[in-house]
């Protein structure tokens, strides 16, 4: 694999613009090579022209012209000249190579003069238009070579400037990310140590109770625990490390000592209690996405554990960023040496070794610190288990048996499906479900439809993962996957092939046995299919990708609790998938009713109640998405989410209107036609609304000012026709509801085939929609250079909100009392400075000074001083006496202790020992 493809495959996609522009350097080196070749060709052509011109005289007078060294003729003397167009000799490209320039008196010389080159074949001097003739040693005589030399120097400077720009870019980005990751680690470390201190004897209690028990140890800092009113989102551009200072790169040992001092056992200032106090003090500045008001200690511990694992993955990615850039620079210098046949790679790599992103050893220190803290805190000192959990596994390559089983199961499934279609066409009234042969065929059809549509979506999702992994789309960030336990497209396709084989086997056995055997035995196989699928989804054992299954269950649990939890991308992304599977809920209700009632009574109760329950169940997925939009509007206060709410409201209205139009509630044909017309109008409006949202919001296309016609500026897929094709097909598949109008004359049971067709079309449309939705989200993250999603949980408040409000009221009352007391003291001090008649004390020298002026030894000439309420004039001498007297009284009242000077000591010279004086 070439390094360019290797770099594109291994790089963090969100940091793509921050890597070395390897292709640009390759192009620059190729241009240098091309310039060198053209320069050699120019020298060869010049010598050939010289030979031809000296061999063939132009006229007889040329032989009579003496050489330049022997000629004494003036510049105005007539000379024989030949004019040749410039484009036949002058090069057209700029180069960075050097050329030797030497010319003899008998050689032919060229010069650039207003798009023409004049060649003097005899005299050696060149005469150009609008210029005086110059001697052979003139710089114009060597003009073409010097022009090439200047072009070579310019290209070399361009290469050097590109190199310096890349150094600056890589160093700046590396330093920024390094500071951010170190800041995150310090925050996590403080909270881990604080939690270890708090949770020693309270592992089974809530964090609120544990903190209330440990509040005597925390002292006055207990009120600094989590408070939602002071939470701020940290600005990543201003992140600084509190444990590691930017003192250059040299001195990894000093960094190690600095981190050794920050460990709990290194100094008294870093003891567990001190770390707890620091964690509490910095809790308000941590980045959080949820309110952990009811979290248990164990959940907080797991959150910190995941945060530390994510921080470790960030550091590993930044280290790989360094190594890839080093390899890129080495490849560039080697290619430069190969093309120019030089030996500059050694000096170039020395220059690379001096860069900050190579010399910095802070990440190594942090990496060891994380490993040690994680091992001792979460793995009880077992380093092997800790490293197995911290390290991200390498890229998964499916073993041959997995690929073989996937292909084998897919092939057998296809064969079984063909046999099923053959049996149903020959023996089953597949178009008219009212036929009694085979028994309960309609119920089994709906059962297999309920399972088959999600299996089809699973196949589509595996293909989606295959394409996105090849395009290096960061699904770990977008969907919130764990990089250590995630499944790849190999696993998804293998699971889909296995489920497809079970599905076709169940359908084949039921169809074959139902034709040849009477009774309920054939229904056993569809029932076993349901049992196997439920076991695979909810299996509690650590088999069949349990972390991924639990992640999916957790995601759908968040979807169903939409109004009560903040909405993440994975929530509304899989909520959209769920809207395409709305028919599955209706089939699920029918299947449950069948196994509970109709299977044993041979009745059709389920079919009679299905038209009334079906619209309610079909409206559940869009209702959940509408509630998610309301929650996002509540959190963000953006009106765009209310527009999304309107889209799903129209979808629900269209579903309800369609159910009413097709139900038996309307006996009058005119009312039924009117309801049908209303449904068509609502469906058209809903389709246009949804298409506009798909193109403008979800895909980000239809930009009128884009450089790509009706698309957007940045496209992730290479071929533009893919976007236009997707826009057309998405429009057509959005209108799949019109099929129901075309087959309105069919019976309600026969329409179940139409429902199957529309469901397959909708799932296919969603499959296509997913590509461009994930692309748009990925480009948004790339624009923000966001590659990781690290969430640090905050510590809870020890008091309820009512107690907090009471505390705030008490603090406000205390502040008001202190202000009133200060005002009274100021009035007392002002009255003391007034005479018996209420006039200010006046001396010979009037000067306005303040306490600061007195301390600094400065004063202002006559004026006034505003002491909040008292405004007066005073004598400087009397003021000095008052201050000295006040200082003496303060010393006596405080047992000769040194008391700092304050303005209150001046105002309260008779009350210096009072409790309210601010000494």
Curated annotation (Swiss-Prot):
Residues 605-806 form the EXS domain. It is found in: Membrane. This is SPX and EXS domain-containing protein 3. Residues 62-137, 242-272, 891-919 are annotated as: Disordered. The record marks 22, 26 as: Important for inositol polyphosphate binding. It comes from the Eukaryota. May play a role in phosphate homeostasis. Binds inositol hexakisphosphate (Ins6P) and similar inositol polyphosphates, such as 5-diphospho-inositol pentakisphosphate (5-InsP7); these are important intracellular signaling molecules. Residues 898-910 have a biased composition (Polar residues). The SPX domain has high affinity for inositol polyphosphates, such as myo-inositol hexakisphosphate and 5-diphospho-myo-inositol pentakisphosphate (5-InsP7). Its affinity for inorganic phosphate is tow to three orders of magnitude lower. Keywords: Membrane, Transmembrane, Transmembrane helix. Residues 1-350 form the SPX domain. Pfam families: EXS, SPX. It comes from Dictyostelium discoideum. SUPFAM superfamilies: beta-sandwich domain of Sec23/24. Its main location: membrane. GO terms for molecular function: inositol hexakisphosphate binding; phosphate transmembrane transporter activity.
């Amino acid at each position: 694999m070439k390094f360019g493809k290797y770099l594109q495959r291994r790089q963090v996609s969100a940091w793509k613009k921050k890597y070395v522009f390897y292709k640009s350097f390759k192009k620059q080196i190729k241009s240098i090579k091309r310039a060198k070749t053209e320069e050699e060709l120019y020298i060869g052509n010049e010598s050939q022209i010289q030979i031809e011109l000296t061999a063939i005289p132009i006229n007889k007078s040329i032989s009579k012209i003496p050489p330049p060294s022997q000629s004494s003729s003036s510049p105005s003397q007539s000379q024989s000249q030949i004019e040749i167009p410039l484009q036949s000799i002058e090069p057209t490209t700029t180069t960075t190579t050097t050329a030797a320039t030497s010319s003899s008196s008998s050689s032919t010389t060229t010069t650039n003069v207003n798009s023409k080159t004049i060649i003097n074949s005899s005299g050696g001097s060149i005469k150009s238009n609008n210029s005086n003739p110059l001697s052979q040693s003139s710089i114009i005589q060597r003009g073409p070579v010097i022009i090439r030399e200047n072009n070579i120097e310019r290209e070399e400077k361009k290469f050097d400037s590109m190199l310096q720009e890349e150094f600056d870019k890589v160093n700046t980005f590396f330093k920024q990310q390094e500071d951010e990751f170190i800041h995150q680690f310090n925050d996590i470390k403080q909270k881990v140590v604080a939690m270890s201190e708090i949770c020693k004897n309270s592992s089974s209690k809530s964090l609120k109770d544990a903190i209330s028990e440990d509040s005597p140890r925390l002292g006055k800092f207990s009120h600094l625990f989590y408070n939602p009113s002071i939470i701020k989102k940290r600005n990543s551009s201003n992140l600084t490390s509190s444990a590691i200072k930017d003192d250059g790169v040299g001195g990894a040992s000093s960094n190690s000592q600095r981190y050794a001092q920050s460990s709990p056992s290194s100094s008294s200032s870093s003891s567990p209690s001190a770390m707890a106090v620091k964690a509490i003090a910095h809790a308000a500045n941590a980045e959080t996405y949820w309110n952990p008001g009811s979290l248990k200690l164990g959940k907080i511990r797991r959150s910190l554990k995941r945060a530390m694992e994510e921080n470790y993955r960030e550091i590993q990615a930044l280290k790989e960023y360094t190594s890839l850039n080093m390899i890129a620079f080495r490849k560039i210098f080697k290619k430069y040496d190969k093309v120019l046949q030089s030996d500059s790679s050694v000096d170039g790599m020395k220059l690379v070794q001096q860069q900050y992103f190579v010399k910095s050893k802070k990440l190594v220190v942090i990496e060891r610190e994380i490993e040690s803290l994680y091992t001792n805190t979460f793995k009880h000192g077992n380093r092997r288990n800790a490293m197995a959990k911290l390290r991200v596994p390498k890229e998964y390559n499916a073993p041959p048996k997995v690929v073989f089983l996937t292909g084998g199961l897919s092939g057998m499934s296809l064969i079984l499906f063909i046999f099923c279609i053959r049996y149903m066409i020959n023996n089953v009234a597949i178009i008219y479900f009212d036929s009694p042969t085979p028994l309960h065929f309609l119920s089994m059809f709906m059962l297999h439809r309920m399972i088959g549509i999600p299996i089809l979506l699973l196949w589509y999702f595996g293909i989606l993962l295959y394409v996105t992994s090849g395009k290096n789309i960061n699904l770990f960030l977008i969907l919130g996957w764990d990089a250590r336990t995630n499944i790849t497209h190999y696993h998804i396709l293998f699971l889909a092939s296995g489920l497809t084989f079970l599905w076709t086997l169940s359908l084949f056995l039921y169809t074959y046995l139902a034709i040849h055997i009477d009774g309920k035995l054939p229904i056993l196989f569809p029932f076993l299919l349901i049992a196997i699928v439920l076991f695979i989804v909810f299996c509690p054992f650590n088999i069949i990708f349990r972390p991924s299954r639990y992640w999916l269950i957790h995601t759908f649990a968040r979807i169903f609790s939409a109004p009560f939890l903040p909405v993440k991308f994975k929530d509304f992304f899989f909520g959209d998938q769920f809207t395409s599977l709305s028919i599955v809920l209706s089939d699920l209700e029918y299947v449950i009713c069948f196994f509970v009632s109709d299977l044993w009574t041979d009745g059709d109760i389920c079919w009679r109640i299905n038209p009334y329950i079906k619209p309610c169940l079909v409206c559940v997925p869009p209702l959940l998405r509408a509630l998610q939009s309301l929650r996002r509007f509540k959190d963000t206060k953006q009106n765009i989410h209310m527009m999304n709410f309107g889209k799903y409201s129209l979808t629900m209205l269209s579903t309800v209107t369609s159910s009413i139009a097709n139900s038996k509630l309307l006996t009058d044909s005119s009312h039924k036609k009117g309801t049908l017309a209303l449904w068509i109008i609502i469906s058209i409006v809903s389709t246009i609304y949804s298409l506009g949202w798909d193109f403008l919001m979800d895909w980000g296309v239809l930009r009128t000012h884009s450089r790509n016609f009706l698309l957007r500026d940045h496209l992730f897929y290479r071929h533009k026709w893919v976007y236009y094709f997707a826009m057309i097909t998405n429009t057509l598949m959005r209108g799949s509801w019109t099929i129901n109008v075309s087959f309105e004359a069919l019976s309600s049971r026969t329409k179940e085939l139409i429902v199957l067709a529309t469901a397959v079309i909708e799932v296919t449309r969603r499959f296509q929609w997913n590509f461009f939705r994930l692309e748009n989200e990925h480009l948004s993250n790339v624009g923000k250079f966001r590659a990781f999603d690290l969430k640090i949980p905050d510590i809870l408040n020890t008091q309820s909100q009512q107690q907090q409000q009471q505390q705030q009221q008490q603090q406000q009352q205390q502040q008001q009392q202190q202000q009133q007391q200060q005002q009274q003291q100021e009035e007392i001090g002002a009255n003391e400075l007034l005479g018996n008649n209420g006039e200010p004390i006046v001396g010979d020298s009037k000067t306005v000074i303040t306490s600061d002026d007195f301390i600094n030894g400065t004063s202002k000439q006559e004026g006034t001083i505003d002491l909040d309420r008292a405004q007066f004039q005073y004598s400087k001498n009397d003021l000095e006496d008052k201050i000295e007297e006040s200082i003496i009284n303060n010393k006596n009242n405080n047992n000769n202790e040194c008391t700092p000077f304050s303005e209150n000591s001046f105002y309260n010279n008779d009350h210096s020992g009072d409790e309210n004086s601010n000494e």
